[in-house]
């Protein structure tokens, strides 16, 4: 008994150290994001005339959007991996990201490129929520998590095919631009998208507080039922929350891979297996990873900006493979 208490105390101290370190790293990443750009603006110059324009009007809304989207995607990945008992589960797996893309393409086609940005964002959220509602329809038939996962994969394939057909046969310049936007990027984010940023905050905070049901869900369906967890209720609630976060993230920045898949894995390999530490850790680490990727996307080319989805995949895949090989040793 004493050994168990000692182990629990050591694990708690380890979790606190990890979360404290991630918090400090996130603050440093925010400062770097505000300073970096075509012109380096040190913190001492943030309140100058130049800083008023570049830092507070251009870089700050972009930095906040990157931070919130990174946190939301990493949290979505952690939730899906526990919910579906599948280490490969990630935000795009259920078809929610592709559903948001279909909503955007439908808005561009029906609006003939004349709709404002907020309307496109609303259509992306609507597309994501429609896919979520279809998944809930399947869930009401009390399908197992594996069957629900396969249903999400099938919906994602259908939505991807619809987007490909629409873009391939379109001569609209807006749709060509939309294809580039779906690769992920924060270049067009300003304070007009603040409502999308605000829409991410309450759901992300709520997810961070759901460690108890998440720990039970991670044990598997049979154990969760034996422990008295209302599995159908929590599965539906978490699918809706995940659909909302992914839909808003796609509306804000396009489709971004790697974050939701790899960040929860990396933290588990580092010892953060308890969702009381894993969920806030995912939010912090996801924000850090996407902030660093955004800085690289801005600075890698002198005359253009790389799609952030390309940067996250290029950075993340080798790191993930290295961590897996290290853990096997």
Swiss-Prot record:
Major location, coarse class?
Answer: membrane
Q: Does the keyword Lyase apply?
A: no
Pfam families in alphabetical order = FecCD
GO terms for biological process, alphabetical: cobalamin transport
Keywords in alphabetical order: Cell inner membrane, Cell membrane, Membrane, Transmembrane, Transmembrane helix, Transport
Instruction: Indicate where this protein resides in the cell.
Output: Cell inner membrane
Transmembrane ranges, per UniProt, are 22-42, 64-84, 91-111, 115-135, 149-169, 187-207, 243-263, 277-297, 305-325
Query: GO CC annotation: what is one?
Result: plasma membrane
Quote the protein name from its UniProt record. Answer: Vitamin B12 import system permease protein BtuC
Organism of origin is: Citrobacter koseri (strain ATCC BAA-895 / CDC 4225-83 / SGSC4696)
């Amino acid at each position: 008994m004493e050994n168990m208490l000692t182990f629990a105390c050591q694990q708690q101290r380890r979790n606190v150290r990890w979360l404290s370190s991630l918090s400090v790293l996130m603050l440093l990443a925010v400062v770097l994001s505000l300073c970096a750009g075509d012109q380096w603006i040190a913190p001492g110059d943030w309140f100058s005339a130049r800083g008023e324009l570049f830092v507070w009007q251009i870089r700050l809304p972009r930095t906040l959007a990157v931070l919130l989207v990174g946190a939301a995607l990493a949290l979505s990945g952690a939730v899906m991996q526990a919910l579906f008992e599948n280490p490969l589960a990630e935000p795009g797996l259920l078809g929610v990201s592709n559903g948001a893309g279909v909503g955007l393409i439908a808005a561009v086609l029906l609006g003939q490129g004349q709709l404002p940005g907020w309307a496109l964002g609303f259509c992306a959220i609507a597309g994501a929520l429609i896919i979520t509602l279809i998944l809930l329809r399947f869930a009401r038939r009390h399908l197992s998590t594996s069957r629900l996962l396969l249903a999400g994969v099938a919906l994602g394939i259908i939505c991807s095919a619809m987007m490909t057909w629409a873009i391939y046969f379109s001569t609209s310049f807006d749709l060509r631009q939309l294809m580039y936007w779906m690769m992920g990027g924060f270049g067009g984010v300003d304070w007009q998208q603040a409502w999308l940023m605000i829409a991410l905050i309450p759901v992300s905070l709520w997810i961070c507080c759901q460690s108890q049901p998440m720990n039970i869900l991670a044990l598997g369906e049979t154990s969760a039922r034996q422990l008295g967890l209302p599995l159908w209720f929590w599965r539906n609630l978490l699918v809706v929350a995940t659909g909302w976060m992914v839909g808003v993230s796609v509306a804000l920045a396009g489709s971004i891979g790697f974050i939701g898949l790899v960040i929860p894995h990396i933290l588990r390999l580092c010892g953060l297996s308890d969702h009381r530490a894993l969920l806030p850790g995912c939010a912090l680490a996801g924000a850090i990873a996407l902030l660093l990727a955004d800085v690289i996307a801005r600075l890698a080319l002198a005359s253009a900006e790389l799609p952030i989805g390309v940067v996250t995949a290029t950075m993340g895949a080798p790191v993930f493979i290295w961590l897996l090989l290290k853990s096997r040793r």
